[in-house]
Amino acid sequence: MSQIQAIRGMSDLLPQETATWQAIELILRDLLNAYGFAEIRVPIVERTDLFRRSIGEVTDVVEKEMYTFEDRNGESLTLRPEATAGIVRAGMTNGLLHNQRQKLWSSGPMFRYEKPQKGRYRQFHQFDIEALGYDGPDIDAEIIIITSRIWRALGIDAVELELNSLGTAASRLEHRQALTAYFERHKDDLDADSRARLDRNPLRILDSKNPDMMALVSAAPVTTDFLDAESVAHFSTLCQLLDQAGINYRVNPRLVRGLDYYSKTVFEWVTDKLGAQGTICGGGRYDGLVSQLGGKPTPAIGCAIGMERLLELYKVCGGQPVMNSPDAYLVAVGGEVLLPAFALVESLRNEAPDIRIEMNCGGGSFKSQMKRADRSGATVALIIGEDELAEKMIGIKALREDSGQISVGWSELGTALKQYIDNMGVGKNG
């Protein structure tokens, strides 16, 4: 019988990677909590209409990439391709936006049916930062500064911030009309996808990945030529706030992002260290999304960090993996030893909860248990055999350096083990 393989484009995250992943997530969580953001968790499955109305019918995501299916009641459901729409829906459903402002973060898997390649997967993970009910460029700057702090905390310097403004609905309409006129003049040069989008949403032609279209797209009208006074003032203040904070950036008038709900500020953090998939974080304002989904007009801004890409960039920039190893591994040898050794290690866990202890389970000779202790990555082995049992003693043997073995009484084990590990210069893992 053949083995069942993982679905193409959906990767397993193995134990040697999860410890580093968790350590990075903890840095993000602590930083967001320090800025007053709270976690929200929303379903990974939503009604398909949520994404059609928010992301936009004429987008690659909705047209080509969503995992959509009918449930047993015939209702169309979709695995979430991004998190913002679900978070906004949750805010509306649960009354979080009634004369309130919310600073939220969330993390979890997203799903898009794309061609799998390095840095682009069909199941991928994002860390989302959302601020609902906040107007003005100050919150835009705060979120961008938070992301900058994340890179700094992880030792990542190979990133560049790109900024643009899409303007208000009125200025976006002017830009759309100019795009339509421009692409109509060059209709014969458009590929089939772009011709289909010309009447429905010409802005999405700018998302084209067709290399034959690049020159045409590069010469298209840009958003900054059509900005209204309000958007100009908003963007100018944002730039001043970033300058004041020492955040370097590049204004990219062709940055539009791939989802229809964006307005005013849009931004991306990009790197040249990961090949074609160089966007690590992207986001912007979506002031019209709540009303678009049936709620009251609510200003908002958010961004998403791609966790797989962030982890890869962390490694490329010299980040060290976090070892998910125990501090101590208990070796118990002899038929009469198991019960008292088991009780001893549980008592030690109560006394010293910060020390990570793995007990050998499943028996085995002294030699085989010591091999397991070494493979576990533990700093020390705790050894108890029949002689130690008779004397109520336990051996502490260093596994990572040649410093011999000492013996201590059971009642002294917690204090002695802490001191022994501290003297070896080993801190708590992770």
Regions found by a protein language model. Give the residues of each.
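TRNA-recognition modules of translation machinery and tRNA-sensing kinases, especially anticodon-binding
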Residues: 1-430
